[in-house]
């Protein structure tokens, strides 16, 4: 059974997220990181207490812990809500992709608040709606970048693509590092609802600017691609 890894700052969305896991993926063990004040009441999870630092460092800690025991995990934002088949569909798609005998990096669910490649509003083929969704939503799609709001990663891939100590662009760095080592990323046909912007806020200029110094120092080869200059 593949565990689910969650790190939280204020825990605002946790009750709904954890209830959706309980109802729709009760077999999945949950690893949860946050302050003792926020997460200590959740007894049916492995808890790691810690003050919030940034997305990358906080998730590195909880994922590293899970992958001591599991061969893979699902990285999950603290403000998503599963549907009845989110967990099962994601893992079914992973098995399909693994049959291609390639190095699999991130495999991420679709959502309503996420980057274009995973966004259910993204309709590059101009599909018509069928039963309230685009036909393309049922297919697995290759992607250069995955936002891990609900995303699978194997232990092997993780050790080649851990997050940097950033909020924004932590996923960009992980995906690019893995791409450069021959891993490929995919969008699953699975779906989760995502509230979004509950922790870092929605000041995109400030969030981008905060990431630039680290990327310039540690991944200068990505600067033009990430920031356009």
Regions found by a protein language model. Give the residues of each.
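N-proximal low-complexity "stem/linker" segments adjacent to membrane-targeting elements
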Residues: 1-20
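A recurrent flexible, glycine/aromatic-enriched loop bordering the glycosyltransferase active site
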Residues: 131-153
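Glycine-rich, basic loop-to-helix element that forms the pyrophosphate-binding segment
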Residues: 50-66
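C-terminal catalytic/acceptor-binding lobe
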Residues: 164-229
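Short beta-strand-to-loop acidic/aromatic patch adjacent to the donor-nucleotide binding site
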Residues: 70-81
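Short beta-strand-to-loop element that shapes/binds the nucleotide-sugar donor at the catalytic cleft/hinge
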Residues: 105-122
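Conserved donor-nucleotide/metal-binding helix-loop-beta segment in metal-dependent transferases, i.e.
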Residues: 87-105
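Short, acidic, metal-binding catalytic loop of nucleotide-sugar glycosyltransferases
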Residues: 19-28
């Amino acid at each position: 059974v593949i565990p689910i890894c969650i790190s939280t700052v204020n825990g605002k969305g946790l009750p709904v997220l954890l209830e959706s896991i309980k109802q729709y993926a009760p077999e999945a063990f949950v690893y949860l990181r946050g302050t003792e004040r926020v997460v200590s009441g959740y007894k049916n999870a492995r808890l790691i207490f810690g003050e919030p630092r940034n997305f990358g460092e906080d998730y590195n800690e909880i994922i590293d812990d899970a992958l001591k025991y599991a061969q893979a995990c699902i990285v999950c934002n603290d403000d998503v809500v599963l549907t009845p088949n989110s967990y099962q569909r994601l893992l079914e798609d992973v098995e399909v992709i693994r049959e291609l005998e390639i190095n699999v990096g991130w495999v991420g669910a679709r959502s309503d608040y996420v980057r274009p490649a995973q966004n259910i509003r993204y309709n590059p083929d101009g599909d018509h709606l069928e039963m309230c969704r685009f036909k393309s939503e049922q297919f697995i799609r290759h992607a250069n970048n995955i936002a891990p709001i609900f995303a699978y990663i194997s232990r092997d891939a993780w050790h080649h693509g851990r997050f940097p100590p950033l909020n924004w662009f932590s996923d960009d760095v992980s995906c690019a590092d893995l791409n450069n080592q021959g891993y490929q990323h995919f969008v699953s046909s699975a779906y989760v609802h995502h509230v979004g912007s509950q922790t870092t806020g929605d000041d995109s200029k400030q969030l981008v600017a905060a990431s630039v110094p680290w990327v310039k120092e540690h991944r200068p080869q990505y600067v033009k691609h990430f920031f356009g200059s």
